[in-house]
């Protein structure tokens, strides 16, 4: 056991470790968000005894856990490691031992993050860690330093993983698997890896300067010494904006596969989908200052960032309409993954529309730092990244585990989280339009109604997550019985471009990507000879 899981160099085992870490961190992050919502359920101090610092520590804990320890490990580390080698017919990733260390620095980062909340009064800086609030004057203990170390460790992990994915995709494709034949999920991980490679060094530079400012008396962000805190914001958001595309692009890849399968049609405009993802990735580097409209940028700078941000809506629109064109006229089967995919389309579009409002520099003067922004990015993350994560889990887990989940329970879980998430985040737009600020644990009585509604929604969503944990348990215990009761996903695959040959176990099935042609669960080493792409 220790040999297999601690020293593992097998991409599939490492992927399972990533999933376990992601589920654990997701539970912790959800618990924090529930405490936040309980505190905000009514005006006045509810649970935190008026401790605003603790409230902000919960906010930063919730944010960092959900972003760096749930979405990225699950979508990139989990699905990426498991499926990318299978889909291109590779034996493993290019650097199996780098893969191992890339995982094992994450638990260390988690330890640093938890420790930072426990020493002194915690890092109450918000996930952006802006100086001067994060400076040694305002946060005197080691909390912020530990949070910076946590971010450094997750950066190292993601960089190593990104290098691994890029080299694997370029060098280890099977015979006949040209770049034009790559499945869309592989493309999405490939593009995400480039984004990580280009943006993370800038974040590391910024937080290292902050570390030096705090402990070694430099003044990068210290006005008294000729520094400028705005420099930190530029460095942080040059990472922070590509980061949100890093979180969602693997989701795009998953949704493409799910929509194709359950409509029984190839994806509409596959090459255009790849170019759209690449354009989104490229443009993501050119728009960072739309997070900073109110720091005193020039009018022409604000005009540029407004226009550039709106241009991102074009490739995003191409993707949405291509998915709709894939569904249109298809033979649609509303299995759980397809429900998540359709919900993703509606809610991600909704989040994108509020984003178009926020892109305007003049409107953002009113919206900045209000709950309108919180509503916007939780629509695209909670109902974009997380819904695609669930879609991918329900789509691939029967193939990965050889065990089926209970379809009826899974659909109940979908409707619970669909209703819950909307009830939480839709009212936040109203609160933001009325000027309720973010990161504040108390508010005037006028905001009480919608906050109460949002807090009820968080209970519904949390209930659905408890149900998901039970579905996992049921899948592992009763998976074979469920397989008899559910029609498995494999018989509804879209007839597409990959022919099976003798190395596959199911010679009758045609599939748009190789992974469903293997045994279920796949062998520890899937391809001892190169797979052949027709």
Swiss-Prot record:
<feature type="transmembrane region" description="Helical">
    <location>
        <begin position="267"/>
        <end position="287"/>
    </location>
</feature>
<keyword id="KW-0679">Respiratory chain</keyword>
<dbReference type="InterPro" id="IPR036927">
    <property type="entry name" value="Cyt_c_oxase-like_su1_sf"/>
</dbReference>
<keyword id="KW-0479">Metal-binding</keyword>
<keyword id="KW-1278">Translocase</keyword>
<feature type="binding site" description="axial binding residue">
    <location>
        <position position="62"/>
    </location>
    <ligand>
        <name>Fe(II)-heme a</name>
    </ligand>
</feature>
<feature type="binding site">
    <location>
        <position position="369"/>
    </location>
    <ligand>
        <name>Mg(2+)</name>
    </ligand>
</feature>
<feature type="binding site">
    <location>
        <position position="42"/>
    </location>
    <ligand>
        <name>Ca(2+)</name>
    </ligand>
</feature>
<keyword id="KW-0408">Iron</keyword>
<comment type="similarity">
    <text>Belongs to the heme-copper respiratory oxidase family.</text>
</comment>
<feature type="binding site" description="axial binding residue">
    <location>
        <position position="378"/>
    </location>
    <ligand>
        <name>Fe(II)-heme a</name>
    </ligand>
</feature>
<feature type="cross-link" description="1'-histidyl-3'-tyrosine (His-Tyr)">
    <location>
        <begin position="241"/>
        <end position="245"/>
    </location>
</feature>
<keyword id="KW-0812">Transmembrane</keyword>
<comment type="subunit">
    <text>Component of the cytochrome c oxidase (complex IV, CIV), a multisubunit enzyme composed of a catalytic core of 3 subunits and several supernumerary subunits. The complex exists as a monomer or a dimer and forms supercomplexes (SCs) in the inner mitochondrial membrane with ubiquinol-cytochrome c oxidoreductase (cytochrome b-c1 complex, complex III, CIII).</text>
</comment>
<feature type="binding site">
    <location>
        <position position="39"/>
    </location>
    <ligand>
        <name>Ca(2+)</name>
    </ligand>
</feature>
<dbReference type="GO" id="GO:0046872">
    <property type="term" value="F:metal ion binding"/>
</dbReference>
<feature type="binding site">
    <location>
        <position position="245"/>
    </location>
    <ligand>
        <name>O2</name>
    </ligand>
</feature>
<comment type="pathway">
    <text>Energy metabolism; oxidative phosphorylation.</text>
</comment>
<feature type="binding site" description="axial binding residue">
    <location>
        <position position="376"/>
    </location>
    <ligand>
        <name>heme a3</name>
    </ligand>
</feature>
<keyword id="KW-0349">Heme</keyword>
<keyword id="KW-0472">Membrane</keyword>
<dbReference type="GO" id="GO:0005743">
    <property type="term" value="C:mitochondrial inner membrane"/>
</dbReference>
<feature type="transmembrane region" description="Helical">
    <location>
        <begin position="452"/>
        <end position="472"/>
    </location>
</feature>
<feature type="transmembrane region" description="Helical">
    <location>
        <begin position="310"/>
        <end position="330"/>
    </location>
</feature>
<keyword id="KW-1133">Transmembrane helix</keyword>
<dbReference type="InterPro" id="IPR023616">
    <property type="entry name" value="Cyt_c_oxase-like_su1_dom"/>
</dbReference>
<dbReference type="GO" id="GO:0020037">
    <property type="term" value="F:heme binding"/>
</dbReference>
<feature type="binding site">
    <location>
        <position position="241"/>
    </location>
    <ligand>
        <name>Cu cation</name>
    </ligand>
</feature>
<keyword id="KW-0460">Magnesium</keyword>
<keyword id="KW-0249">Electron transport</keyword>
<feature type="binding site">
    <location>
        <position position="441"/>
    </location>
    <ligand>
        <name>Ca(2+)</name>
    </ligand>
</feature>
<comment type="function">
    <text>Component of the cytochrome c oxidase, the last enzyme in the mitochondrial electron transport chain which drives oxidative phosphorylation. The respiratory chain contains 3 multisubunit complexes succinate dehydrogenase (complex II, CII), ubiquinol-cytochrome c oxidoreductase (cytochrome b-c1 complex, complex III, CIII) and cytochrome c oxidase (complex IV, CIV), that cooperate to transfer electrons derived from NADH and succinate to molecular oxygen, creating an electrochemical gradient over the inner membrane that drives transmembrane transport and the ATP synthase.</text>
</comment>
<feature type="transmembrane region" description="Helical">
    <location>
        <begin position="57"/>
        <end position="77"/>
    </location>
</feature>
<keyword id="KW-0999">Mitochondrion inner membrane</keyword>
<dbReference type="InterPro" id="IPR033944">
    <property type="entry name" value="Cyt_c_oxase_su1_dom"/>
</dbReference>
<protein>
    <recommendedName>
        <fullName>Cytochrome c oxidase subunit 1</fullName>
        <ecNumber>7.1.1.9</ecNumber>
    </recommendedName>
</protein>
<dbReference type="InterPro" id="IPR000883">
    <property type="entry name" value="Cyt_C_Oxase_1"/>
</dbReference>
<feature type="binding site">
    <location>
        <position position="368"/>
    </location>
    <ligand>
        <name>Mg(2+)</name>
    </ligand>
</feature>
<feature type="transmembrane region" description="Helical">
    <location>
        <begin position="182"/>
        <end position="202"/>
    </location>
</feature>
<keyword id="KW-0106">Calcium</keyword>
<keyword id="KW-0496">Mitochondrion</keyword>
<feature type="transmembrane region" description="Helical">
    <location>
        <begin position="414"/>
        <end position="434"/>
    </location>
</feature>
């Amino acid at each position: 056991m220790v040999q297999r899981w601690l020293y593992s160099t097998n991409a599939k085992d490492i992927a399972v470790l990533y999933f376990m870490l992601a589920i654990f961190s997701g539970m912790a992050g959800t618990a924090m968000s529930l405490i936040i919502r309980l505190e905000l359920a009514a005006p006045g101090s509810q649970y935190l005894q008026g401790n605003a610092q603790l409230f902000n520590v919960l906010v930063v804990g919730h944010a960092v856990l959900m972003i760096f320890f749930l979405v990225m490990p699950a979508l990139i580390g989990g699905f990426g490691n498991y499926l990318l080698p299978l889909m291109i017919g590779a034996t493993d990733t290019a650097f199996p031992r780098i893969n191992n260390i890339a995982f094992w620095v994450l638990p260390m980062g988690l330890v640093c993050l938890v420790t930072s909340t426990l020493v002194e009064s915690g890092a109450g800086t918000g996930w952006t860690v802006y100086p001067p609030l994060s400076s040694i004057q305002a946060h005197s203990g080691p909390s912020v330093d530990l949070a910076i170390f946590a971010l450094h460790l997750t950066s190292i992990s993601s960089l190593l993983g990104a290098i691994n994915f890029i080299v694997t995709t370029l060098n280890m494709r099977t015979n006949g698997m040209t770049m034009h034949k790559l499945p869309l999920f592989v493309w999405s991980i490939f593009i995400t890896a480039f984004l990580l490679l280009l943006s993370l060094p800038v974040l590391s530079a910024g937080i290292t300067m902050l570390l030096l400012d705090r402990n070694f008396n430099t003044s990068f962000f210290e006005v008294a010494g000729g520094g400028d805190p705005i420099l930190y914001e530029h460095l942080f958001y040059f990472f922070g904006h590509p980061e949100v595309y890093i979180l969602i692009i693997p989701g795009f890849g998953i949704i493409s596969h799910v929509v194709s399968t359950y409509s029984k049609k190839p994806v509409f405009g596959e090459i255009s989908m790849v170019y759209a993802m690449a354009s989104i990735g490229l443009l993501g580097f050119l728009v960072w200052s739309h997070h900073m409209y109110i720091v005193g940028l020039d009018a022409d700078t604000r005009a540029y960032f407004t226009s550039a941000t709106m241009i991102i809506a074009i490739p995003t629109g191409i993707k949405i309409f291509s998915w709709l064109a894939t569904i249109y006229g298809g033979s649609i089967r509303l299995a759980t993954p397809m429900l998540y995919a359709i919900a993703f389309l509606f809610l991600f579009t909704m989040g994108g529309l509020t984003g178009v409002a926020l892109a305007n520099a003049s409107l953002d003067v009113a919206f900045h730092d209000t709950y309108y922004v919180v509503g916007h990015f939780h629509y695209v993350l909670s109902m974009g990244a997380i819904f695609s994560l669930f879609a991918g889990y329900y789509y691939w887990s029967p193939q990965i585990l050889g065990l089926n989940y209970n379809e009826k329970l899974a659909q109940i879980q979908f409707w619970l989280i669909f209703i819950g998430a909307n009830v939480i985040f839709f009212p936040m737009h109203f609160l933001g339009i009325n000027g309720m600020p973010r990161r504040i644990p108390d508010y005037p009585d006028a905001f009480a109604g919608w906050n109460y509604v949002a807090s009820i929604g968080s209970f519904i969503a949390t209930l659905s997550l408890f149900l998901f944990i039970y579905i996992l348990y049921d899948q592992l215990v009763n998976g074979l019985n469920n397989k008899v009761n559910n029609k498995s996903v494999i018989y509804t695959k879209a007839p597409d471009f990959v022919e099976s040959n003798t190395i596959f176990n199911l010679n009758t099935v045609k599939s748009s990507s190789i992974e469903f042609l293997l045994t279920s669960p796949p062998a520890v080493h899937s391809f001892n000879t190169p797979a052949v792409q027709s």
